[in-house]
């Protein structure tokens, strides 16, 4: 046998040994199987930057945790006159395995939960309701935000100035709860407060002009659309009225830069969206079966600090 033949024989034997070892240890190279969860995020919030940031956080988590996610906002279906119950049922009929739900009405939320099969886990975002279907509650610390607003108003307030809380009469339970807290906390800080509910946002014109002409007034609103409407009046009419509030949108950012809005509390919607989807997918895959309540904080934003690095992740998470 020549040297060349011996080399070929050795290579053949080596190949046979390697194949035997692979088969005996069941070491077969395959494409990794990935379980994809079919989930829905269904919300009832204005089409502002909070909605966009929440959606972006949810999308990022869906990619990271292999979820096929549908993001639905009730406001997109106003022309079709579709209600929240119908949206949820549509997703269930389409094979949805889990839901992240945000609803402006506690009563409606409870009705929806009653009709969701027990085997479908639900993560509530900024919504209060009790049900065995609810596996996690994700919200923001309302009391902390109310204290922050009272603190900022008190710091800037001149002696004798009072506060007017302004919102639309049909706003969500959550927003009304915020104003309930503020109505309680301002007097504790020695600040007189009154409450005004608008039947239509167009009424902001007369309200702002009246308060500005009267003098001695500061305005706080946790209704972003009311805040935007009042800031627009200040800009168009050239009136000066200290405006404070809660919310985040392109218009609020613009009015902060123009100093028609003094400051706002902005919640970490991106973080809330990411955690909600992360939690839901881990429940579905069996990695996390613990019920959990998570509260996200807010940051104080003014025209001067909104582009600080410490606030970028909350205000502009996908910039």
Model features per residue range: what roles?
Residues 107-144, 249-257:
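Flexible loop/hinge segments that line or gate small-molecule binding clefts
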Residues 9, 271, 275-319:
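Hinge/cleft segment of the Venus flytrap/periplasmic-binding protein
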Residues 137-163, 248-252, 268-285:
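Hydrophobic alpha-helical segments within soluble ligand-binding/sensing domains
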Residues 8-24:
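Hydrophobic membrane-insertion alpha-helices, especially the h-region
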